[in-house]
Amino acid sequence: MALLSSSLSSQIPTGAHHLTLNAYANTQCIPHFFSTLNAGTSAGKRSSLYLRWGKGSNKIIACVGEDSLSAPTLVKREFPPGFWKDHVIDSLTSSHKVAASDEKRIETLISEIKNMFRSMGYGDTNPSAYDTAWVARIPAVDGSEQPEFPETLEWILQNQLKDGSWGEGFYFLAYDRILATLACIITLTLWRTGEIQVQKGIEFFKTQAGKIEDEADSHRPSGFEIVFPAMLKEAKVLGLDLPYELPFIKQIIEKREAKLERLPTNILYALPTTLLYSLEGLQEIVDWQKIIKLQSKDGSFLSSPASTAAVFMRTGNKKCLEFLNFVLKKFGNHVPCHYPLDLFERLWAVDTIERLGIDRHFKEEIKDALDYVYSHWDERGIGWARENPVPDIDDTAMGLRILRLHGYNVSSDVLKTFRDENGEFFCFLGQTQRGVTDMLNVNRCSHVAFPGETIMEEAKTCTERYLRNALEDVGAFDKWALKKNIRGEVEYALKYPWHRSMPRLEARSYIEHYGPNDVWLGKTMYMMPYISNEKYLELAKLDFNHVQSLHQKELRDLRRWWTSSGFTELKFTRERVTEIYFSPASFMFEPEFATCRAVYTKTSNFTVILDDLYDAHGTLDDLKLFSDSVKKWDLSLVDRMPQDMKICFMGFYNTFNEIAEEGRKRQGRDVLGYIRNVWEIQLEAYTKEAEWSAARYVPSFDEYIDNASVSIALGTVVLISALFTGEILTDDVLSKIGRGSRFLQLMGLTGRLVNDTKTYEAERGQGEVASAVQCYMKDHPEISEEEALKHVYTVMENALDELNREFVNNREVPDSCRRLVFETARIMQLFYMDGDGLTLSHETEIKEHVKNCLFQPVA
């Protein structure tokens, strides 16, 4: 991977005689070439350039002296030694072995998960005791004094928990248990049955209701302040012995009254809102004839069985009854808190397996799920179900991001539905409270912006602010879900947004954060077994460790290649085989891309070697000789090269002959000429930079970018590696990712700019004159350095948005090739997140990323 170091060949102005550096008098002087030998010197004398080492990593100070006898000598340039020595790698890989039975278990899990996806219908979820109690209230439509759905009443009688409550036994949430228990004891009392259960429920209520005061407001279920006080009033009329004067009960009643006072009467009937979800708590104020006009197509009121049951008992509406029969046909003797959940289930299931890094096993299933979602996509947004009339930002943002990345035509304008006049984003129309999970999903969505999508930039700014504040407020977690580690998810998303979140690192992180027993909060607590389950997690762990073991074998082979090529003798360059291999392993990690990873790593290593050679080590004459040797592919020129350059060329010649032969087998045609041409263009860019340095020439910003986007060498790595992505690449396809393509140019541009923003200060301190920042300041001498840096960041961010569009829309290029280009751009954003992550990898987070990706198995 071409992660360019600071250029050292341009540190002394032509014509300079001396550079006095008394502060570094005790440092060692190391000779360096000076191309214009007689420039600015007295007749018969030559200038010699020296480099002195100062304090800190790779800190170099230049000085010039006159020497009438000696010719200029080559630089002895040193870098921090490589961290990943063989003994370090061996110490991390020897303790973990992948069991032979794991592969069979992986196959079994893949088959079981495929069946889960294929069986997706309207959404699978757990019983809601609260909603079942409301459905059980309905009297028989034939006029008999029996329940219309006796099986639901029986379910209540049979499903009381040992502590006297109703709800999910594995997770105690006081809000949820108290609400469900109150609903059940009222229903049993109305039907004059289950006296023992009622008494046990009352005792639970008395002893546990006070615990609500200790729970965070964010754990209060949706509509609790509407339905709970209404049911308490009903319980009081029924004569149930409950602690009606508890402080928290008074507070909830006050919240209800305040909310209803803020509610304009006309809005309840003007358009569908979340109030339709809680109509059972608004019975004293609802005009039932008006409310029927807002009924969903499926007969429900916002997919809520409880709300729909309340409307039916008031109106006798046949569509309400049809909906309730439809739900009970699915679940038998109980109902969930809302149904259907078809869009929610599919989107979150796809998102889950993608984040866990196992999506490659389920391509057909993902396509089927997304085709289904897209068929119900609405430009005003979507909700959790296909016929839900109230869109929410959570499902909409998740859908926008995933559908866009999978090539579906969706517009970011859909987010405008959820923005208020103050520029803030909300989950539902008319709602002011937000949750961490929905804002997290909007934030993730905002990073897949296209050029000119200001709504995405606004969403990014708004949600980043909200999420950073939420990290400081424990009570902010969370309104819509009780997740294993939502805080960890937020921290990861803010630190590693889309453009520097590599698939393998995200999988590693999400495996740790993912909760197979996570629950969501609607009107009651509910689970989604096709979203949160042990099978996803087990497969993710087994698959991660299996792939990691393959990567370790590949890395050992590549390290042997480095040694056998004689590159350990090259003291002027960086040995970073492991860090470079980490790059393709972090995104093209699948077993079938083993050759692609090897070619990517070898090519990238040569871009580093030759960058260091052209940047600071070889004379212009030697560099011209090397370039000619590559152009002519002529071994006879090797004898004229210095020893270290011979090693470079022989390794280069042998390696790319081997790569070309393998490419011929893969592509069915000779590719050596193609590879040589790719390298000729690369070496021309290196040579131009060397010439600029020798002449102390500072190009314009545009001139600099034109060359630097090539010299960054990402294009060279990608164009050669693309031959090994498993696709037969025609000339037409190659042209779409070739040097002239906008896709490749954007990759090089963003890579160059992120490099410069993090290294220009250090390079300037070493005497470097050309960087994006410095060249822009030359064009605009009136601006400050801070303004120039801001401009460079703006150019880069706009280019990343354009890169998103190229990645998504460039469908004439095979998926694997698109990934190769796009992910190479993203890995640069990661490597240069905090500085020079290649040269100083041992001092940056890259060291931990390498360890987690390649060596540390997941438990």
Curated annotation (Swiss-Prot):
E.C. number: 4.2.3.32, 5.5.1.12
Question: Which annotated residues bind Mg(2+) 4?
Answer: 392, 394
One family from Pfam that matches here is Terpene_synth
Pathway of action: Terpene metabolism; oleoresin biosynthesis
Catalysed reaction, written as an equation: (2E,6E,10E)-geranylgeranyl diphosphate = (+)-copalyl diphosphate; (+)-copalyl diphosphate = abieta-8(14),12-diene + diphosphate
Q: Which InterPro entries match?
A: Isoprenoid_synthase_dom_sf, Terpene_cyclase-like_1_C, Terpene_cyclase_plant_C1, Terpene_synth_N, Terpene_synth_N_sf, Terpene_synthase-like, Terpene_synthase_metal-bd, Terpenoid_cyclase/PrenylTrfase
Q: List ligand-binding residues for substrate.
A: 259, 479
Q: Where does Mg(2+) 1 bind?
A: 611, 615
Residues the record lists as binding Mg(2+) 2: 611, 615
* Residue ranges of the motif DDXXD motif: 611-615
Q: Which GO terms describe its molecular function?
A: copalyl diphosphate synthase activity; levopimaradiene synthase activity; magnesium ion binding; terpene synthase activity
Q: Which GO terms describe its cellular component?
A: chloroplast
Q: Spell out the subcellular localization from the entry.
A: Plastid, Chloroplast
Show where the record puts the motif DXDD motif. 392-395
Record GO biological process: defense response; diterpenoid biosynthetic process
Q: What is known of its domains?
A: The Asp-Xaa-Asp-Asp (DXDD) motif is important for the catalytic activity in the class II active site relevant for the cyclization of GGPP. The Asp-Asp-Xaa-Xaa-Asp/Glu (DDXXD/E) motif is important for the catalytic activity in the class I active site, presumably through binding to Mg(2+).
Name of the protein in its database record: Bifunctional levopimaradiene synthase, chloroplastic
Q: Which organism is it from?
A: Picea abies (Norway spruce)
